[in-house]
Amino acid sequence: MITVGDLGLKEDKVLESMVLAAKWFAEIAQVKTESLTVEKNPGRLLHKYWKGAIRGEYRVAEKTWSFFCPIWHTGQAVKALVLAYHVTGIEEFLESAILGAEFILHERVSDPNDPDYGLIFGYEDLGYAVNTSAILECLDGLIYLSKATGDKTYWDAVIDALEWLSKKAYINGTGIFRDVYNPSTRSFIKAPWYREGLEGRPLLDDGIFLKGFLKTGKERFRKIFYETAEKLLQDEYPPGNWVKYPPSDVNHGILHPRMAYWWGRPMVMAYLDSKEKRFLDCAIRAGDWYTKAQRRDGGLFRHTYIDLSTECFGHETSGIACASILWLELMEVFGNERYLKPLEKAIKFCMRVQFTKPLNPNLKGCILSKVLPPDGSDKSPYHIRDLATIFYVQATAKLLEPKYRLEINMI
Protein backbone atom coordinates (compact mmCIF):
# COMPACT_ATOMS: atom_id res chain seq x y z
CA MET A 1 0.00 0.00 0.00
CA ILE A 2 1.43 3.36 -1.11
CA THR A 3 2.06 5.91 1.64
CA VAL A 4 3.18 9.53 1.71
CA GLY A 5 6.63 8.40 2.79
CA ASP A 6 6.98 6.34 -0.38
CA LEU A 7 6.91 9.64 -2.30
CA GLY A 8 9.76 11.11 -0.29
CA LEU A 9 7.37 13.54 1.39
CA LYS A 10 6.55 14.20 5.01
CA GLU A 11 2.97 13.46 6.01
CA ASP A 12 2.60 16.65 8.04
CA LYS A 13 3.67 18.77 5.05
CA VAL A 14 1.16 17.10 2.70
CA LEU A 15 -1.56 17.43 5.33
CA GLU A 16 -0.75 21.11 5.85
CA SER A 17 -0.90 21.69 2.10
CA MET A 18 -4.22 19.86 1.73
CA VAL A 19 -5.78 21.80 4.61
CA LEU A 20 -4.65 25.11 3.12
CA ALA A 21 -6.17 24.12 -0.24
CA ALA A 22 -9.48 23.04 1.33
CA LYS A 23 -9.65 26.31 3.26
CA TRP A 24 -9.45 28.16 -0.06
CA PHE A 25 -12.87 26.70 -0.90
CA ALA A 26 -14.44 27.17 2.50
CA GLU A 27 -13.14 30.67 3.19
CA ILE A 28 -12.37 32.32 -0.17
CA ALA A 29 -13.86 30.73 -3.30
CA GLN A 30 -17.36 29.84 -2.11
CA VAL A 31 -20.29 32.21 -2.68
CA LYS A 32 -21.90 33.06 0.66
CA THR A 33 -24.90 35.02 -0.63
CA GLU A 34 -27.99 33.92 -2.57
CA SER A 35 -27.30 36.50 -5.29
CA LEU A 36 -24.04 37.39 -7.00
CA THR A 37 -21.99 40.31 -5.69
CA VAL A 38 -18.39 40.69 -6.91
CA GLU A 39 -18.59 37.75 -9.31
CA LYS A 40 -19.11 38.02 -13.05
CA ASN A 41 -21.40 35.71 -15.01
CA PRO A 42 -20.07 35.98 -18.58
CA GLY A 43 -21.92 32.89 -19.77
CA ARG A 44 -25.25 34.28 -18.50
CA LEU A 45 -25.94 31.07 -16.61
CA LEU A 46 -29.58 31.01 -15.55
CA HIS A 47 -29.03 30.04 -11.92
CA LYS A 48 -31.48 31.70 -9.54
CA TYR A 49 -29.76 30.66 -6.30
CA TRP A 50 -25.98 31.00 -5.92
CA LYS A 51 -25.24 30.47 -2.24
CA GLY A 52 -22.74 27.62 -1.84
CA ALA A 53 -21.49 27.68 -5.45
CA ILE A 54 -17.74 27.66 -6.00
CA ARG A 55 -16.40 30.64 -7.93
CA GLY A 56 -14.41 28.58 -10.36
CA GLU A 57 -12.47 31.13 -12.42
CA TYR A 58 -10.12 33.83 -11.16
CA ARG A 59 -8.10 36.01 -13.52
CA VAL A 60 -5.17 37.22 -11.43
CA ALA A 61 -4.31 40.18 -13.68
CA GLU A 62 -7.78 41.73 -13.32
CA LYS A 63 -8.53 40.28 -9.87
CA THR A 64 -11.92 39.16 -11.15
CA TRP A 65 -14.03 36.12 -10.28
CA SER A 66 -16.30 34.34 -12.72
CA PHE A 67 -17.86 30.93 -13.43
CA PHE A 68 -17.72 28.25 -16.09
CA CYS A 69 -19.97 25.40 -14.89
CA PRO A 70 -20.60 25.87 -11.17
CA ILE A 71 -22.86 22.81 -10.82
CA TRP A 72 -20.30 20.13 -11.56
CA HIS A 73 -17.37 22.14 -10.23
CA THR A 74 -19.21 22.61 -6.94
CA GLY A 75 -20.17 18.93 -6.82
CA GLN A 76 -16.53 17.93 -7.15
CA ALA A 77 -15.56 20.54 -4.55
CA VAL A 78 -18.12 19.01 -2.18
CA LYS A 79 -16.41 15.66 -2.68
CA ALA A 80 -13.01 17.24 -1.99
CA LEU A 81 -14.29 18.98 1.15
CA VAL A 82 -15.88 15.80 2.52
CA LEU A 83 -12.63 13.91 1.96
CA ALA A 84 -10.68 16.70 3.67
CA TYR A 85 -13.15 16.53 6.57
CA HIS A 86 -12.69 12.77 6.91
CA VAL A 87 -8.92 13.12 6.98
CA THR A 88 -8.78 16.09 9.37
CA GLY A 89 -12.04 16.21 11.33
CA ILE A 90 -12.24 19.96 10.63
CA GLU A 91 -15.96 20.82 10.85
CA GLU A 92 -15.56 23.89 8.64
CA PHE A 93 -14.96 21.60 5.66
CA LEU A 94 -18.14 19.62 6.25
CA GLU A 95 -20.15 22.83 6.71
CA SER A 96 -18.79 24.18 3.44
CA ALA A 97 -19.62 20.89 1.70
CA ILE A 98 -23.22 21.09 2.96
CA LEU A 99 -23.47 24.67 1.68
CA GLY A 100 -22.22 23.51 -1.74
CA ALA A 101 -24.75 20.69 -1.83
CA GLU A 102 -27.54 23.13 -0.97
CA PHE A 103 -26.67 25.10 -4.11
CA ILE A 104 -27.01 21.94 -6.21
CA LEU A 105 -30.28 20.91 -4.55
CA HIS A 106 -31.76 24.36 -5.10
CA GLU A 107 -30.81 24.28 -8.79
CA ARG A 108 -32.86 21.28 -9.89
CA VAL A 109 -36.41 20.23 -10.67
CA SER A 110 -37.75 19.01 -7.32
CA ASP A 111 -41.48 18.82 -8.12
CA PRO A 112 -42.41 15.11 -8.59
CA ASN A 113 -45.25 16.17 -10.91
CA ASP A 114 -42.91 17.96 -13.32
CA PRO A 115 -41.95 15.91 -16.42
CA ASP A 116 -38.32 16.90 -15.78
CA TYR A 117 -38.32 15.81 -12.14
CA GLY A 118 -34.75 15.04 -11.08
CA LEU A 119 -33.08 17.27 -13.67
CA ILE A 120 -30.17 19.28 -12.26
CA PHE A 121 -29.45 22.58 -13.99
CA GLY A 122 -25.88 21.96 -15.10
CA TYR A 123 -25.57 25.07 -17.25
CA GLU A 124 -22.21 25.12 -18.96
CA ASP A 125 -21.39 26.04 -22.57
CA LEU A 126 -24.78 27.63 -23.17
CA GLY A 127 -26.17 29.66 -20.31
CA TYR A 128 -29.73 28.44 -20.88
CA ALA A 129 -29.01 24.74 -21.57
CA VAL A 130 -27.89 21.81 -19.42
CA ASN A 131 -24.89 19.60 -20.17
CA THR A 132 -25.48 15.91 -19.44
CA SER A 133 -21.87 15.48 -18.34
CA ALA A 134 -22.27 18.34 -15.85
CA ILE A 135 -25.11 16.49 -14.14
CA LEU A 136 -23.11 13.28 -13.90
CA GLU A 137 -20.01 15.02 -12.59
CA CYS A 138 -21.80 16.83 -9.76
CA LEU A 139 -23.31 13.69 -8.23
CA ASP A 140 -20.32 12.08 -6.51
CA GLY A 141 -20.12 14.95 -4.05
CA LEU A 142 -23.72 14.30 -3.01
CA ILE A 143 -22.94 10.60 -2.52
CA TYR A 144 -19.94 11.39 -0.33
CA LEU A 145 -21.90 13.94 1.69
CA SER A 146 -24.82 11.58 2.22
CA LYS A 147 -22.50 8.98 3.68
CA ALA A 148 -20.69 11.54 5.84
CA THR A 149 -23.85 13.07 7.29
CA GLY A 150 -26.29 10.15 7.18
CA ASP A 151 -28.72 12.42 5.32
CA LYS A 152 -30.46 10.39 2.60
CA THR A 153 -31.72 13.57 0.90
CA TYR A 154 -28.46 13.79 -1.04
CA TRP A 155 -28.58 10.17 -2.25
CA ASP A 156 -32.25 10.64 -3.19
CA ALA A 157 -31.25 13.57 -5.42
CA VAL A 158 -28.61 11.37 -7.06
CA ILE A 159 -31.12 8.63 -7.82
CA ASP A 160 -33.66 11.14 -9.12
CA ALA A 161 -31.00 12.60 -11.45
CA LEU A 162 -30.00 9.13 -12.68
CA GLU A 163 -33.65 8.32 -13.40
CA TRP A 164 -33.95 11.51 -15.46
CA LEU A 165 -30.71 10.80 -17.31
CA SER A 166 -31.65 7.18 -18.02
CA LYS A 167 -35.05 8.13 -19.40
CA LYS A 168 -34.26 11.38 -21.21
CA ALA A 169 -30.55 11.57 -22.08
CA TYR A 170 -29.50 7.96 -22.64
CA ILE A 171 -29.98 6.41 -26.08
CA ASN A 172 -31.02 2.86 -25.28
CA GLY A 173 -28.57 0.11 -26.13
CA THR A 174 -25.89 2.40 -27.56
CA GLY A 175 -23.67 3.50 -24.66
CA ILE A 176 -24.29 7.08 -25.82
CA PHE A 177 -25.85 10.02 -23.99
CA ARG A 178 -27.35 13.05 -25.67
CA ASP A 179 -25.35 16.06 -24.61
CA VAL A 180 -27.26 19.34 -24.29
CA TYR A 181 -30.83 19.83 -23.00
CA ASN A 182 -32.92 23.00 -23.14
CA PRO A 183 -35.29 22.95 -20.13
CA SER A 184 -37.49 25.71 -21.56
CA THR A 185 -38.39 23.65 -24.64
CA ARG A 186 -37.91 20.27 -22.91
CA SER A 187 -35.77 19.09 -25.79
CA PHE A 188 -32.18 18.20 -26.62
CA ILE A 189 -30.39 20.57 -28.95
CA LYS A 190 -27.17 20.47 -30.94
CA ALA A 191 -24.11 20.80 -28.75
CA PRO A 192 -21.69 23.64 -29.55
CA TRP A 193 -19.14 20.95 -30.43
CA TYR A 194 -21.55 18.98 -32.65
CA ARG A 195 -20.05 17.05 -35.57
CA GLU A 196 -21.96 15.18 -38.28
CA GLY A 197 -22.56 11.60 -37.20
CA LEU A 198 -21.88 12.27 -33.52
CA GLU A 199 -25.19 11.83 -31.67
CA GLY A 200 -23.65 12.25 -28.25
CA ARG A 201 -20.91 10.84 -26.04
CA PRO A 202 -20.27 7.68 -23.97
CA LEU A 203 -20.23 9.35 -20.53
CA LEU A 204 -18.84 7.04 -17.85
CA ASP A 205 -17.92 9.90 -15.51
CA ASP A 206 -17.23 8.82 -11.90
CA GLY A 207 -18.92 5.46 -12.53
CA ILE A 208 -22.11 7.05 -11.23
CA PHE A 209 -24.51 4.61 -12.85
CA LEU A 210 -22.67 1.65 -11.34
CA LYS A 211 -22.76 3.34 -7.94
CA GLY A 212 -26.47 3.97 -8.45
CA PHE A 213 -26.98 0.27 -9.15
CA LEU A 214 -24.99 -0.78 -6.09
CA LYS A 215 -27.11 1.54 -3.95
CA THR A 216 -30.53 0.67 -5.38
CA GLY A 217 -30.21 -2.67 -7.15
CA LYS A 218 -31.82 -1.17 -10.27
CA GLU A 219 -30.53 -3.32 -13.13
CA ARG A 220 -31.15 -0.57 -15.68
CA PHE A 221 -28.44 1.53 -14.06
CA ARG A 222 -25.95 -1.34 -14.27
CA LYS A 223 -26.92 -2.03 -17.89
CA ILE A 224 -26.28 1.61 -18.85
CA PHE A 225 -22.92 1.60 -17.10
CA TYR A 226 -21.67 -1.49 -18.91
CA GLU A 227 -23.08 -0.52 -22.31
CA THR A 228 -21.19 2.76 -21.96
CA ALA A 229 -18.00 1.00 -20.89
CA GLU A 230 -18.26 -1.32 -23.90
CA LYS A 231 -18.71 1.64 -26.23
CA LEU A 232 -15.58 3.24 -24.80
CA LEU A 233 -13.59 0.04 -25.30
CA GLN A 234 -14.80 -0.01 -28.90
CA ASP A 235 -13.85 3.63 -29.60
CA GLU A 236 -10.63 3.90 -27.58
CA TYR A 237 -7.90 5.74 -29.50
CA PRO A 238 -5.14 6.48 -28.82
CA PRO A 239 -4.60 3.76 -26.18
CA GLY A 240 -5.98 4.97 -22.87
CA ASN A 241 -7.78 7.94 -24.39
CA TRP A 242 -10.60 9.01 -26.72
CA VAL A 243 -9.69 11.68 -29.27
CA LYS A 244 -12.91 10.95 -31.18
CA TYR A 245 -15.08 12.68 -28.61
CA PRO A 246 -15.24 16.30 -27.43
CA PRO A 247 -13.79 18.07 -25.53
CA SER A 248 -10.85 16.42 -27.30
CA ASP A 249 -10.31 17.67 -30.86
CA VAL A 250 -10.11 14.87 -33.41
CA ASN A 251 -9.43 17.27 -36.32
CA HIS A 252 -6.22 18.57 -34.75
CA GLY A 253 -5.34 15.48 -32.72
CA ILE A 254 -5.61 17.28 -29.36
CA LEU A 255 -6.46 15.31 -26.24
CA HIS A 256 -8.27 16.86 -23.29
CA PRO A 257 -6.26 16.51 -20.05
CA ARG A 258 -9.06 14.98 -17.96
CA MET A 259 -10.69 12.64 -20.49
CA ALA A 260 -8.51 9.66 -19.53
CA TYR A 261 -9.62 10.30 -15.94
CA TRP A 262 -13.35 10.61 -16.55
CA TRP A 263 -13.54 7.58 -18.82
CA GLY A 264 -10.46 5.54 -17.89
CA ARG A 265 -10.76 5.61 -14.10
CA PRO A 266 -14.30 4.10 -13.97
CA MET A 267 -12.85 1.09 -15.78
CA VAL A 268 -11.25 0.22 -12.42
CA MET A 269 -14.75 0.12 -10.95
CA ALA A 270 -15.96 -2.01 -13.87
CA TYR A 271 -13.14 -4.46 -13.17
CA LEU A 272 -13.80 -4.62 -9.42
CA ASP A 273 -17.51 -5.22 -10.06
CA SER A 274 -17.28 -7.64 -12.99
CA LYS A 275 -13.80 -9.15 -12.43
CA GLU A 276 -13.25 -8.84 -16.22
CA LYS A 277 -9.60 -7.97 -16.78
CA ARG A 278 -10.22 -6.18 -20.08
CA PHE A 279 -11.68 -3.27 -18.12
CA LEU A 280 -8.63 -3.10 -15.88
CA ASP A 281 -6.39 -3.26 -18.95
CA CYS A 282 -8.14 -0.16 -20.30
CA ALA A 283 -7.63 1.67 -16.99
CA ILE A 284 -3.96 0.72 -17.11
CA ARG A 285 -3.68 2.14 -20.62
CA ALA A 286 -5.22 5.38 -19.32
CA GLY A 287 -2.71 5.43 -16.47
CA ASP A 288 0.11 4.78 -18.91
CA TRP A 289 -1.12 7.60 -21.18
CA TYR A 290 -0.78 10.01 -18.29
CA THR A 291 2.78 8.88 -17.60
CA LYS A 292 3.66 9.66 -21.23
CA ALA A 293 1.85 13.01 -21.26
CA GLN A 294 3.38 14.12 -17.96
CA ARG A 295 6.16 16.68 -18.35
CA ARG A 296 9.56 16.14 -16.76
CA ASP A 297 8.81 18.50 -13.87
CA GLY A 298 5.56 16.66 -13.07
CA GLY A 299 2.96 18.89 -14.76
CA LEU A 300 0.61 18.53 -17.71
CA PHE A 301 -0.65 20.77 -20.51
CA ARG A 302 -4.18 21.53 -21.60
CA HIS A 303 -3.35 20.80 -25.25
CA THR A 304 -1.49 17.51 -25.46
CA TYR A 305 -1.38 16.14 -28.99
CA ILE A 306 -1.61 12.49 -30.00
CA ASP A 307 2.16 12.47 -30.56
CA LEU A 308 2.51 13.82 -26.96
CA SER A 309 3.87 17.19 -28.11
CA THR A 310 2.45 20.30 -26.42
CA GLU A 311 2.22 24.03 -26.79
CA CYS A 312 4.40 26.27 -24.60
CA PHE A 313 1.55 27.79 -22.58
CA GLY A 314 -1.80 26.64 -21.26
CA HIS A 315 -0.82 24.35 -18.39
CA GLU A 316 -3.60 22.33 -16.79
CA THR A 317 -2.65 21.25 -13.29
CA SER A 318 -6.04 19.63 -12.73
CA GLY A 319 -5.08 17.02 -15.33
CA ILE A 320 -2.07 15.76 -13.41
CA ALA A 321 -4.01 15.87 -10.13
CA CYS A 322 -6.63 13.63 -11.79
CA ALA A 323 -3.85 11.35 -13.00
CA SER A 324 -2.65 11.08 -9.40
CA ILE A 325 -6.06 9.78 -8.29
CA LEU A 326 -6.09 7.21 -11.10
CA TRP A 327 -2.53 6.08 -10.31
CA LEU A 328 -3.35 5.69 -6.62
CA GLU A 329 -6.39 3.54 -7.42
CA LEU A 330 -4.50 1.39 -9.90
CA MET A 331 -1.66 0.75 -7.45
CA GLU A 332 -4.23 -0.11 -4.79
CA VAL A 333 -5.64 -2.78 -7.11
CA PHE A 334 -2.22 -4.01 -8.23
CA GLY A 335 -0.58 -3.92 -4.84
CA ASN A 336 2.63 -2.72 -6.50
CA GLU A 337 4.49 0.52 -7.23
CA ARG A 338 4.04 0.80 -11.00
CA TYR A 339 3.11 4.51 -10.93
CA LEU A 340 5.05 5.58 -7.87
CA LYS A 341 7.55 7.87 -9.63
CA PRO A 342 4.96 9.70 -11.78
CA LEU A 343 2.79 10.13 -8.69
CA GLU A 344 5.72 11.54 -6.73
CA LYS A 345 6.46 14.06 -9.48
CA ALA A 346 2.78 15.03 -9.77
CA ILE A 347 2.18 15.68 -6.07
CA LYS A 348 5.44 17.60 -5.72
CA PHE A 349 4.56 19.69 -8.77
CA CYS A 350 1.14 20.59 -7.34
CA MET A 351 2.72 21.53 -4.02
CA ARG A 352 5.25 23.75 -5.79
CA VAL A 353 2.55 25.70 -7.60
CA GLN A 354 0.38 26.23 -4.53
CA PHE A 355 0.04 29.82 -3.35
CA THR A 356 1.14 29.62 0.29
CA LYS A 357 2.14 33.24 0.95
CA PRO A 358 0.64 35.42 -1.79
CA LEU A 359 0.24 39.18 -1.62
CA ASN A 360 -3.23 38.73 -3.13
CA PRO A 361 -5.40 37.14 -0.39
CA ASN A 362 -7.77 35.62 -2.98
CA LEU A 363 -5.02 33.18 -3.94
CA LYS A 364 -4.05 31.79 -0.56
CA GLY A 365 -4.08 28.01 -0.63
CA CYS A 366 -5.17 27.45 -4.22
CA ILE A 367 -3.22 25.55 -6.84
CA LEU A 368 -2.11 27.41 -9.96
CA SER A 369 -4.04 26.02 -12.92
CA LYS A 370 -2.43 27.56 -15.95
CA VAL A 371 0.00 30.13 -17.29
CA LEU A 372 -1.55 32.11 -20.13
CA PRO A 373 0.39 33.12 -23.26
CA PRO A 374 1.73 36.70 -23.39
CA ASP A 375 -0.69 39.40 -24.58
CA GLY A 376 1.81 42.21 -25.09
CA SER A 377 1.44 43.59 -21.57
CA ASP A 378 3.25 42.85 -18.33
CA LYS A 379 0.07 41.76 -16.51
CA SER A 380 0.18 38.52 -14.53
CA PRO A 381 -0.27 35.53 -16.83
CA TYR A 382 -1.67 33.39 -14.00
CA HIS A 383 -5.16 31.99 -14.32
CA ILE A 384 -6.88 30.11 -11.52
CA ARG A 385 -9.47 27.42 -12.11
CA ASP A 386 -10.94 25.71 -9.08
CA LEU A 387 -10.43 22.30 -10.71
CA ALA A 388 -6.70 22.16 -9.98
CA THR A 389 -7.37 22.71 -6.29
CA ILE A 390 -10.40 20.38 -6.27
CA PHE A 391 -8.58 17.38 -7.67
CA TYR A 392 -5.44 18.13 -5.67
CA VAL A 393 -7.44 17.95 -2.43
CA GLN A 394 -9.09 14.72 -3.58
CA ALA A 395 -5.73 13.22 -4.53
CA THR A 396 -3.91 14.18 -1.33
CA ALA A 397 -6.83 13.05 0.85
CA LYS A 398 -6.76 9.65 -0.85
CA LEU A 399 -2.98 9.56 -0.49
CA LEU A 400 -3.23 10.32 3.24
CA GLU A 401 -6.16 7.94 3.86
CA PRO A 402 -6.01 4.76 1.71
CA LYS A 403 -9.50 3.53 2.62
CA TYR A 404 -10.99 6.21 0.33
CA ARG A 405 -9.10 5.08 -2.79
CA LEU A 406 -11.46 2.43 -4.17
CA GLU A 407 -14.83 4.14 -4.31
CA ILE A 408 -17.24 1.31 -5.07
CA ASN A 409 -16.16 -0.28 -1.78
CA MET A 410 -17.76 2.70 -0.03
CA ILE A 411 -21.34 2.42 -1.36
Model-derived regions, located:
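Glycan-recognition and catalytic cores of secretory/periplasmic carbohydrate-active enzymes
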Residues: M1-I411
